[in-house]
Amino acid sequence: MFFRLPVVRFFNRVINRAMVTVALVLLQIGWLLWAFFSLTAGKVWVNAGLNVLSLFITLYLVRKDENSDYKIIWLVLIGMMPLLGGALYLAFGNKAPAKRMRQRMQAVERQHTADLAQQPGQTDALDPASRGLSRYISEYGPYPAWKNSTAKYYPCGEAMYPDLLADLEKAERFIFLEFFIVRTGKMWDGVEDILVRKAAQGVDVRLIYDDFGSLLGLPSDFVVKMERAHIRCIPFNPVMPLVSLVMNHRDHRKIVVVDGNTAYTGGINLADEYINEEERFGYWKDAALRTEGAAVWNFTVMFLDHWNAFRPSEEDYAPFMPQAEALSAQSDGVIQPYGDSPLDEEALAETVYLNIINQAQRYVYIYTPYFAVGETMLEALKAAAKRGVDVRLVLPGIPDKKLVFRLTRSYYVPLFRAGVRIYEFTPGFLHAKCYVSDDRAAVVGSINMDYRSLFLHFECEALLLYNSQVIALRDDVLRTLPECREVQLADCRTSLAGTLLDSVLRLLSPLM
């Protein structure tokens, strides 16, 4: 036989779950379309009811205290499709998670607010602008800023992976992992081997993975297998196509915490393309950040809040605090990890990005795989370039989603005319999500510049202020630019049909 029986069984398990889910989703979509057209065909009262629903949704959005760009694009969509617009918003645009999820998560977060209290003196050495940004995150996150912390920036997944394995091998107390995508392969096999051994040694090993993000990557008995190995698991927000088509509120975070002393974040998931063991869209360019010291506590609390909302295990987080030597670690500027979620109306991630852009005096360089933003972000980038700031946007040269890439390119002309320099990473797909500005501030994390990351998903990131790795990120961007193609105005020309398609994509951007 060419394939061993276990390989065949594994392949069948993955395909079976994926195929069943896809079939159920298609069945539900078909049923909903049939029901919509059947109910609305010649049914004046049904049409009137849908119009009234759209009217109420419109009034609700006008009064709702949330990002104006997000509201406006939904108001336009509802105005153009009054029969369907209100229902689409309820299905795909409503940022509030399901009531049960919201109640569980908010209860845990309220219980542990004191665990994230800002300690005095952490930001005293910062300039006023940096101190103000840090204060915003600590008050509205709330995630405190920390001295006594160090960081290491990785310009790609294959640079990070050996250090990650080495840190996992050192674990003595606990290992927490939280990822959007976990997929079987070389990367996961290396991690899993260590997790199984550590769990057998009595280390507390826990894994949260997004059920939708990992749908095609894991066998249906994955949780059972992990639990047998004493690795506790939570598939976050399980996919239930016959219950809901909504794919919002995904756990897009990337977090590893080892013993409360070391943490990782960035754009890298646990799948082979992230360390270039598998080629999907050319070379996979990503970024990650390793943190040591007091700042790791923020990541620990982020993880435990998610964990205890769905699998209550402990009320006291104190046993998971960094050890004494970590709390007294060498200081390298200020590090402030933070999370963003759809549980509140605070657009934390977008506000941090806007602050960095608006405060920039010399330069701001941005890595992002997707660019689908509102007028506020667009105008901030244009205004920075117009006042003489060197604004550079680095995007993929080989996209993973063709329509999203076309949507991204629809923003090129206004940005280019304002003086923003745009680059496409020609060797492959750029998946990093990073900002760096003025040798002063940087962010590295999981947050894309699109509606889903900024408003609908659970995300995480780390802000670096006057940290040595700000320069490391800047240098990585400058090394990457020669590998890119700089976009010129002539590259942005399109036909009338293309312009119309771009307009439609802009209108539908919250759904993409």
Regions found by a protein language model. Give the residues of each.
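Phosphate-/nucleic-acid-contacting segments
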Residues: 363
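Active-site donor-binding acidic/aromatic loop of nucleotide-activated sugar
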Residues: 422-426
